[in-house]
Amino acid sequence: MTTEIMQISLSHNPADARWGEKALISTNDQGVTIHLTSHDQLGGIQRAARKIDGQGIKQVKLAGEGWGLEQSWAFWQGFRGPKGQRSVVWAELPANEKTELEQRLQIIDWVRDTINAPAEDLGPEQLAKNAIDLLCAVSCDAVSYRITKGEDLREQNYAGIYTVGRGSDRAPVLLALDYNPTGNPDAPVMACLVGKGITFDSGGYSLKQSAFMDSMKSDMGGAATLTGALALAAARGLKERVKLYLCCADNMVSGNAFKLGDIIRYRNGKTVEIMNTDAEGRLVLADGLIDASEQNAPLIIDAATLTGAAKTALGNDYHALFSFDDELAQALLTSAHSEHELFWRLPLAEFHRSQLPSNFAELNNVAGGAYSAGASTAAAFLSHFVKNYQQGWLHIDCSATYRKSAVDQWSAGATGLGVRTVANLLLAQAKQ
């Protein structure tokens, strides 16, 4: 590993032939040059940063022309890794772009570090407290919150979070956080954000194999993403009231854990039969969505690392988007495009809502064997807990939250993707 500060410059000319056809980087006495000859220039910078990091270069200076906000951020996305120290001397930016870069570094790096944290270090209550700390660091005067924990969840009829989390020695937690910059306690709520915060998912009695369990410290990625999104929106100047609900629990095996055949009775009257304890994320989100629906906000967004089916469809490159509201879905896709993040809308139709049959309850927590659209039926399950599910509700299945191994653009671990898109959407909705 080199300890000298390496200069990194950008060029729109191809590399000399000795570096190979279509070479992305070349070196000389002045440092490393990134050659931007493809249409995907931000992606090229990110891939080049991975190569530079892979060569053991950990201290760099972005030099020369072309280093705007998005180019600088693309470099950091690729350069950053989950272990070891890295430092960047940033190119000069206009004041507003410098502020935005600093906010992304603070908030999105928090999201990535939080998702990467070992489950031993990050239980349900700690996740909730860390979320409070982040939002207080950004706009503490506008933040109030309530933590409901353990037996209090049962007594207050948060049946999903309590049931999933009761098998762990670490108590389940619901964080209800109110971001209200208006100063008016009666101000209307513009949006509610509901995040899945499963701090470790063993699968419960529907036990995962090790190959599928080894990344389950990241099963709280939805909660971290929405916390970061609210923090970034606040840092960018959001003036409307938003409520954040983090549904936090461990899904473990024990003598007190929930079992197949159990029936959960929710506060909105729905009953759910458990046919797979590894479909637990939707069970905790249901409690948060019930609370969110009671706020009568025109916008509800939930985010969760919910299904393997979404990853099968989209890989780890895109987040999956589901909604009955075409206009709102398009608004999110517009926000994603403007923030250079990848989302893809997957099907969600009224008939999916009837594909969760149970002989003993109103709903099954997994689709019947004849229905194989697992990501769509998971979204449909959630719709039963949103009062006005046909309008103003978005579900994000966070398939791009975490990578088990490095690829050409990303190190192993959390990506932070989705934070900017949701923050952008909140600000866009606030202008309407």
Curated annotation (Swiss-Prot):
Q: Which CDD domains match?
A: Peptidase_M17 (cd00433)
Pfam families membership: DUF3663, Peptidase_M17
| Chemical reaction(s) catalysed | Release of an N-terminal amino acid, Xaa, from a peptide or arylamide. Xaa is preferably Glu or Asp but may be other amino acids, including Leu, Met, His, Cys and Gln
Q: Tell me, which GO biological process terms does this entry list?
A: proteolysis
Q: Which organism is it from?
A: Yersinia pseudotuberculosis serotype O:1b (strain IP 31758)
Q: One GO term of the cellular component aspect?
A: cytoplasm
**UniProt similarity note:** Belongs to the peptidase M17 family.
User: What interactions and quaternary structure are annotated?
Assistant: Homohexamer.
Catalytic center at which residues?
208, 282
* Cofactor binding notes: Binds 2 manganese ions per subunit.
EC number of this enzyme: 3.4.11.23
**UniProt-recorded name of the protein:** Peptidase B
| Biological function | Probably plays an important role in intracellular peptide degradation.
Q: What is the lineage of its organism?
A: Bacteria, Pseudomonadati, Pseudomonadota, Gammaproteobacteria, Enterobacterales
